[in-house]
Each structure stands twice: as structure tokens, then as C-alpha cells.
Amino acid sequence: MPARCVAAHCGNTTKSGKSLFRFPKDRAVRLLWDRFVRGCRADWYGGNDRSVICSDHFAPACFDVSSVIQKNLRFSQRLRLVAGAVPTLHRVPAPAPKGGEEGDQAGRPDTRGELQAARHSEAAPGPVSCTRPRAGKQAAASQYSVGTEEITCENEVVQTQPHADNPSNTVTSVPTHCEEGPVHKSTQISLKRPRHRSVGIQAKVKAFGKRLCNATTQTEELWSRTSSLFDIYSSDSEIDTDWDIKSEQSDLSYIAVQVKEETC
């Protein structure tokens, strides 16, 4: 039979993963252990050499530091106590379930579902007619104001066809003509096309001189100018050639005269 902890409301063994410690041989320390056990057990008269107490009843300062490190690293499963360690922690008993109340609850019928159903039935709204809310929504949509916008509309009465479920005709108001009042800047929308054009589309014609000429007249003027210049150049060249011929003839006559004088 495995050894069990002798403390009240505790029965831990080594199979529970707890370390068990035998009562010390020192008489003074053993008396303190007995007093601890007797505090919760009236039938305890004294422990013997086989009596043990588990590690749950000792404070952390009662354990050897090296044994704690070894257990945390899983090198060892058993803790060691320092000299003169005394148990001080009692285990609180778990509350036992009350059998009388459970029997009463089992014997009583389950009335929670009925109470919840009654509450839901009270809170649930009844059926609402479909004609009035629709007319109210349409009227609210036709008359609205945004910011400082004030719109007065002349409504035209339009009769709709009677619905199969509702024989009465529903009359709704549809806005046809509106007169706009002062409107806030953030709500103004201009639907008109702008009168100006983009910069990339605008075509500007710059007039040089007092009048504009087409391409044909400009080419004729250019041709007349070039022809006149050509005539001037040709006449100048002819004058130059005539002058050169005359100068050469005068030079030849001068040379002939000199030759005649030398021969004479």
C-alpha cells in the first residue's frame, strides 16, 4: 500500500507527482509537525516513522534550491527540505455538492423555457401594415433639407393601382417642380456644361500685318521677289562681262602700239 499524506483533506501519493517527507527524528521539530496535523484533524495523536506529509503543505522557502532546479530541469522528481522545515499550509476542502437542492431541481419541471418564451412573445412586435410606412418613407424622401438648403416643392398627386391585399388606393406625392432657395456651398452641384474650353483645344490665329493672305498669294509674292532678284543679278553679270571685254581690248591695243614703236 503506497504511503499517503496524513494532513487533513489530503491523500497525495508519489503517483500524484508530489514529494512525500517522513516525520523528522528531532523531537522538537516532530512536535511542530504533529501540531500542524492536529490543527485540522482532531483524531490525530502523533506521527510515527512511517507517517509522511506531501510537498503541498510546505512554503517555497522550505525547499532546497538545488533540488528545485533539478526538478524544473526534469533531472529529478523529488524535492528536498532544508533543516528545521515545518509545514504551514493547509489544504482547503472542496465544497461538496448539495444533494437536497439537486433533488429538488430534478423534481421540479423545467420552467425556464416557458418564462423565456413568454418574455420573447411580449417583446416581439406585432404585424405592421406595409402601406403607411411606405407612404411615410416616400414623403420623407420628397421633403428633405441638407445644411441650410430649403426646397419648396409643388407636388403632383399620382394615384397608384390598388394592391391585391389592400383594396384602398394609396396616394403618394411626387415632386415635379422645385424652387431652390439658398444652398450651402458644400451641397451645390452644377449640372450645366462649362462655357469655356480647355487650353489644349483652343486655337488662336495671330495676324501679321493689317490683313491675312492665303497660301497662293504668299507663294506668288515670293516668286515675284525671287524673279526680280534674279533679273537684277543677271543684268549685273552682263554689265561685268562687257566691261571685262572692253578692258581686255584696250589692253591689247595698247600692247600693239608699243610693239609698233619698238620695231620702228
UniProtKB/Swiss-Prot annotation:
Disulfides per UniProt = none
According to the UniProt record, where is the region Disordered?
A: 90-136, 160-195
| Keywords (A to Z) from UniProt | DNA-binding, Metal-binding, Zinc, Zinc-finger
ZnF (THAP-type) intervals: 1-90
For bias type Basic and acidic residues, the affected ranges are: 99-122
Mark out the compositionally biased spans (Polar residues). 160-175
Specify the protein name. THAP domain-containing protein 10
